[in-house]
């Protein structure tokens, strides 16, 4: 694995949703670095990628309430333990659970293993509320997938908050877990 600046030079074998991610970041003037890798399906693999990226790789959890009427994307450091009961109480929601894959595709155009804050660019009707753990906000860089789990990127957390989220018309709620 090798850290590279910006978008891939050759994009013929890349999915359109990945290219749209790079297009968005480039349009916003967000500097980012990228590493290509085998599919990252576990946090253990992500931790190896983290060593190359030198960024906080987040657990990105796609959650919903019992009625499947409210949807949340939670970003927490990979080192934190997640308890649905605690988060549900903090945001005043009925007990949260993991969302069905079809909602991931419908709202974020992503599949399990590729969940990313950058998927919010596809949520044009704001079905998903972003929740960010305070420790993620304290990190200089955030690491995430460009809507596909065979690449990972890092960029300044401040760019996420100040450029990316406003551009995709999403705000966030800070949580302490």
Language-model features and meaning:
Residues 1-177:
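Extended, low-hydrophobicity, polar/charged segments
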């Amino acid at each position: 694995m090798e850290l590279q600046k910006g978008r891939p030079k050759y994009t013929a074998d890349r999915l359109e949703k990945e290219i749209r991610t790079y297009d968005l970041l480039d349009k916003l003037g967000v500097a980012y670095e990228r590493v290509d890798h085998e599919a990252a399906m576990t946090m253990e693999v992500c931790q190896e990628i983290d060593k190359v990226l030198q960024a906080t790789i987040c657990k990105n959890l796609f959650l919903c309430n019992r009625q499947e009427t409210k949807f949340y994307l939670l970003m927490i450091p990979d080192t934190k333990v997640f308890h649905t009961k605690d988060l549900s109480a903090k945001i005043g929601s009925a007990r949260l659970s993991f969302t069905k894959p079809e909602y991931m595709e419908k709202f974020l155009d992503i599949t399990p293993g590729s969940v990313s804050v950058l998927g919010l660019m596809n949520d044009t009707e704001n079905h998903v509320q972003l929740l960010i753990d305070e420790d993620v906000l304290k990190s200089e860089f955030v690491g995430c997938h460009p809507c596909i789990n065979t690449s990972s990127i890092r960029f300044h957390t401040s760019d996420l908050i100040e450029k990316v989220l406003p551009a995709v018309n999403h705000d966030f709620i800070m949580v302490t877990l």
